[in-house]
């Protein structure tokens, strides 16, 4: 019998000093984010992309604790977590950290929908409640339109109506036993907002052969900036109110440099090494406004990341999930991610990126984000959303 995993993002996480658990989470997330970004970009050639690898971790953590045998071991390897006890501790610490975030609007929520007449395994129910903060609700999947409507309404409520129609009624039927849903919502204001009156249409070079006019925000800002030769790019980090959240933008030096940058970002340590070069300075930023929504088939993406048994009947072995002797597996996994960046700040399921050009007539550099770029939304150094902008 089948299980559906649905994930949607607008996200974040917060932490003070880094503990051992937070270090484990950061390293796990860095590795997972690099792999997932590479796969999602591959599936969306030449398109704007936003994703939240971070929001995939909690449901995979839950499914790891619900599984046994090789399927269990495969999930822990993918999460870069050594055992069940560390998995529980890491995600419990994560939930505490999220609740402590200040200065931005942040919400993380989890819910498990179970087929009418079935119950969660007692131990799994306790872990889902105490570690992941998951709500549980029974629904009649045979009434697929009503069931999808209930799930989608909950999703809309958790994401300020930004993520709609996550679950297709056609994906639900009498064989559906459970739907796992995870949501992360982030809305933050720039610490130093852009003035709307300064926004104007400016050139954006989609490619060497295509230039368009896009609304571009302009402002003199205190940022962290670096030239990053190993990425052949410039990097800027801009803070949100509260100083826990920030947006990193990586702008290739070449108009057609985004593909080469994507290849370099397959290394999960590439970004952290580049960030070591950042220093505080003042710049005049030219940043295009943008809004992106991406729907990702996580079943395909995760399978390409060597998470295969979870989706294979007879091999998933989700024996600790429900009080049933049926053989369960994940039939579908979906993520919808959204981000909007404007003069006020960001509302997200993603992040943004930008580039730099030196100026000779002023004492501080100008940063012209006028070609395809990579972006990342972080909280206390943990990537929550990332993506690329090809055409704002």
UniProtKB/Swiss-Prot annotation:
CDD domains: serpin1K-like (cd19579). SUPFAM superfamilies: Serpins. The record marks 359-360 as: Reactive bond. Residues 1-16 form the signal peptide. Pfam families: Serpin. Glycans are attached at residue 85. Induction: By bacterial infection. Keywords: Glycoprotein, Protease inhibitor, Secreted, Serine protease inhibitor, Signal. GO terms for molecular function: serine-type endopeptidase inhibitor activity. Transmembrane segments: none annotated. GO terms for biological process: response to bacterium. InterPro entries: Serpin_CS (IPR023795), Serpin_dom (IPR023796), Serpin_fam (IPR000215), Serpin_sf (IPR036186), Serpin_sf_1 (IPR042178), Serpin_sf_2 (IPR042185). Coiled coil: none annotated. Hemolymph. It is found in: Secreted, Extracellular space. One of its GO terms (cellular component) is extracellular space. Belongs to the serpin family. Inhibits elastase. This is Alaserpin. It comes from Manduca sexta.
């Amino acid at each position: 019998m089948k299980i559906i995993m649905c994930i949607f993002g607008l996200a974040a996480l917060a932490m003070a000093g880094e503990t051992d658990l937070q270090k484990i989470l950061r390293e796990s997330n860095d590795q997972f984010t690099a792999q997932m970004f590479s796969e999602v970009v591959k599936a969306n050639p030449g398109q704007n992309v936003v994703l939240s690898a971070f929001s995939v971790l909690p449901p995979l953590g839950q499914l790891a604790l619900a599984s046994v045998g090789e399927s269990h071991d495969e999930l822990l390897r993918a999460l870069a977590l050594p055992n069940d006890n560390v998995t529980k501790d890491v995600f419990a610490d994560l939930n505490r950290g999220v609740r402590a975030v200040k200065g931005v609007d942040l919400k993380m929520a989890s819910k498990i929908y179970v087929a009418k007449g079935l119950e969660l395994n007692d131990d799994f129910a306790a872990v889902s409640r105490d570690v992941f903060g998951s709500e549980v609700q029974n629904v009649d999947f045979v009434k697929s339109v009503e069931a999808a409507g209930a799930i989608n309404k909950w999703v809309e409520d958790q994401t300020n109506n930004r993520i709609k129609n996550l679950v297709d009624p056609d994906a639900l039927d009498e064989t559906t036993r459970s739907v796992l849903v995870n949501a992360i919502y982030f809305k933050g204001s720039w610490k130093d907002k852009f003035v709307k009156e300064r926004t104007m249409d400016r050139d954006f070079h989609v490619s060497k052969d295509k230039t368009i006019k896009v609304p571009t925000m302009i402002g003199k800002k205190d940022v962290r900036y670096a030239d990053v030769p190993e990425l052949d790019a410039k990097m800027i980090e801009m803070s949100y109110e509260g100083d826990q959240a920030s947006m990193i933008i990586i702008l290739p030096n070449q108009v057609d440099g985004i593909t080469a940058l994507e290849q370099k970002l397959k290394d999960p340590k590439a970004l952290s090494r580049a960030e070591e070069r950042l220093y505080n300075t003042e710049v005049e930023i030219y940043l295009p406004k943008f809004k992106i929504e991406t729907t990702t088939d996580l079943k395909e993406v995760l399978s390409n990341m060597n998470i295969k048994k979870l989706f294979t009947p007879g091999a998933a072995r989700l024996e600790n999930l429900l009080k049933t002797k049926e053989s369960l597996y994940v039939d579908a996994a979906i993520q919808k991610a959204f981000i909007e960046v404007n003069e006020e700040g960001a509302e997200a399921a993603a992040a943004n990126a930008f580039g730099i050009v030196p100026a000779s007539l002023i004492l501080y550099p100008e940063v012209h984000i006028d070609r395809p770029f990579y972006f990342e939304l972080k909280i206390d150094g943990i990537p929550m959303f990332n993506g690329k902008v090809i055409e704002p």
